[in-house]
């Protein structure tokens, strides 16, 4: 195998495919990238046996063939070469990477040992605007847990909802729901968020085909293919947590709320909540940390309902408000012990349900 390509283009396809490679895998082959060249096209594949990423690049193909190269080292080596054309040649158990002087020789891994990746796309595919899906996943993904000991909570639920797609994630402290109109879906599948987080950075955000199969979810664009193993678990019943109406409602500018919570977080630690006193005329935020001090401020807003004080984790509150794509934030509550619902003014496509902290 021998190719020539522009340094930045080659580094890009190696880096994007390398996002699927597990750095801690006990199998050396899973720390490599499969590079295949045929007909002027380079295809690069990385996998950890649960997530696979395949990227493509048109190259000057001097000789077709295949090799497996160390993922991180190869991508870093190409990136460190001088700008311009780069050559990559595989022969006699080594891969030589050269460009305008510098030369790397890397040990080749066995192509025969690399896992077989099925390129077949399931029959039921949906065409989506990749940018829309990537944005929706970035919003709802804040609710997913990072605790691998609870795999059910590490995923994003894809399910049909009124002819469209609904995305749902929860870590048991908060629930994020995003409805995406114009994207059809059938059934429901639970997909690991750690892989979905890489969607835009691996295959891009252009026109996309999405297929949710029995074993894996597949996302394909003209820049690449991301396949993720489905989580075989039952997602928590969440609909009962979303009441049809709330008796208390606050409207407040997003920037003002974010700035105020940010100042409160300077005093608070992760386990110390910010208190929100909701009353006619707005909201009073306060945080008290006995050994350090306190911070208090008032934000003007529109409030209807009974005066009440509710407390939230500062980080969870900040992440939820930041994810809302609106200049005005709506906070709806039932009482100080039940979850509060955050969404944008006139927009409930994204909803963020946050458990309060008991005072």
What are these regions (language model features)?
Residues 1-359:
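Structural preference for solvent-exposed beta-strand-turn elements
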């Amino acid at each position: 195998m021998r190719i020539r390509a522009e340094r930045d283009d080659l580094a890009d396809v190696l880096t994007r495919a390398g996002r699927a490679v597990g750095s801690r895998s006990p199998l050396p082959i899973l720390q490599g990238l499969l590079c295949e060249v045929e007909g002027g096209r380079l295809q690069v594949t990385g996998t950890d046996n649960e997530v696979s990423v395949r990227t493509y690049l048109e190259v000057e193909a001097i000789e077709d063939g295949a090799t497996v190269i160390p993922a991180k080292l190869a991508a870093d080596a190409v990136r460190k070469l001088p700008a311009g054309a780069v050559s990559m040649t595989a022969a006699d158990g080594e891969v030589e990477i050269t460009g305008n002087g510098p030369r790397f020789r890397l040990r080749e891994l066995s192509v025969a040992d690399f896992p077989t990746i099925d390129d077949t796309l399931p029959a039921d595919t949906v065409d989506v605007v990749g940018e829309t899906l990537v944005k929706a996943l970035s919003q709802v993904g804040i609710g997913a847990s990072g605790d691998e000991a609870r795999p059910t909570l590490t995923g994003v639920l894809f399910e049909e909802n009124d002819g469209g797609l609904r995305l749902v994630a929860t870590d048991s402290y908060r629930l994020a729901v995003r409805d995406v109109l114009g994207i059809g879906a059938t059934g429901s599948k639970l997909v690991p968020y750690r892989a979905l987080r890489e969607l835009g950075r691996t295959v891009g955000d252009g026109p996309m085909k999405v297929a949710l199969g029995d074993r894996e979810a597949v996302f394909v664009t003209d820049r690449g293919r991301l396949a993720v193993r489905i989580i075989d678990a039952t997602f928590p019943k969440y609909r009962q947590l979303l009441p049809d109406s709330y008796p208390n409602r606050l409207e407040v500018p997003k920037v003002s709320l974010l700035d105020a919570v940010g100042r409160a977080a300077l005093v608070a630690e992760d386990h110390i909540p910010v208190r929100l006193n909701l009353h006619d005329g707005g909201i009073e935020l306060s945080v008290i940390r006995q050994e350090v001090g306190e911070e208090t401020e008032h934000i003007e807003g529109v409030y209807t309902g009974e005066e009440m004080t509710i407390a939230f984790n500062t980080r969870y509150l900040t992440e939820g408000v930041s994810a809302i794509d609106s200049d005005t934030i709506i906070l709806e509550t039932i009482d100080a012990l039940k979850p509060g619902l955050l969404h944008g003014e006139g927009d409930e496509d994204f909803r963020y349900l946050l458990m309060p902290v008991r005072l």
